[in-house]
Amino acid sequence: MTPTRKINPLMKLINHSFIDLPTPSNISAWWNFGSLLGACLILQITTGLFLAMHYSPDASTAFSSIAHITRDVNYGWIIRYLHANGASMFFICLFLHIGRGLYYGSFLYLETWNIGIILLLTTMATAFMGYVLPWGQMSFWGATVITNLLSAIPYIGTDLVQWVWGGYSVDSPTLTRFFTFHFILPFIITALTTLHLLFLHETGSNNPLGITSHSDKITFHPYYTIKDILGLFLFLLILMTLTLFSPGLLGDPDNYTLANPLNTPPHIKPEWYFLFAYTILRSIPNKLGGVLALLLSILILTAIPVLHTSKQQSMMFRPLSQLLYWLLATDLLILTWIGGQPVSYPFITIGQMASVLYFTTILILMPIASLIENKMLEWT
């Protein structure tokens, strides 16, 4: 008799996606981050829903409503810090997931890759708006600085900024609309994730060797469900350790001070996961140039499939490309570090050098290294 999971229309959908899904037998722990991102999304929506029940999106009451959640609501403190640190874990998983895609050549699955980039941009927008909601000093000034970047757009810039603000400065209307978008975007992310999976299952998963694995596939369940559950437990261990022992570690102390438009913090900076892009923005003295560089630092991912000149999909057997890949990873860590430092010598120079290296590695060095490796293959 045929199992119900193969007959029932709804269960059949789940079955084809998570149970009987043919999966390459050799995918490593780097393939765990997709399911971890799904877990992060569920965690963020759940905790966010409970926070929204007690939050007040108004400039006069937002900060005190956060204090009320933390002090008076049953387990409000853990819900709040799980949501804040859950966002950090979300981005760690996201960066590692993208890093794996770059290393093993998953970007050649164009539809999946492009939807992934849209997902990244949507997640970044959601996180930015969420950071504004507690209405602390860094929330207010972060929102002011980042939304002000729109004024770099010629002719319509100033009008656009005032339109986004809902007035002549960041105030209650800005907070209300940011809360609205912060609430709706995770559901849009969920829909995009479904599309991401749909396109992925059209081609099947990539594998570390970067070769077709049709002749050697196994069912997703029980092999990879067990592997994913192990990954989930390790993820929860790190998240709970962070949340229970050092909840404010990744945040900014300035955000525990109520927003004050008359007092600018000495060093305005976004959350740690945006610092690499923030450094690239600051490295260019021209405002419009900085904004374009900021956008390109993310949108450059769309060019990766075009810049792929190697005859091999994966970097597993390409030592030169591996060297440049880890150079790029180190460069991103340097950019992140510089973003958290004040705008003074030597940090400005280091930031500019790291920014140039970031674009040079992706646009010039990696394609050249791939061509050299192709030649080396011919010599052997």
Swiss-Prot record:
A ubiquinone binds at H201. Its cofactor is heme b. The keyword Cytoplasm does not apply. The chain crosses the membrane at residues 33-53, 77-98, 113-133, 178-198, 226-246, 288-308, 320-340, 347-367. Keywords: Electron transport, Heme, Iron, Membrane, Metal-binding, Mitochondrion, Mitochondrion inner membrane, Respiratory chain, Transmembrane, Transmembrane helix, Transport, Ubiquinone. PANTHER family: CYTOCHROME B (PTHR19271:SF16). This is Cytochrome b.
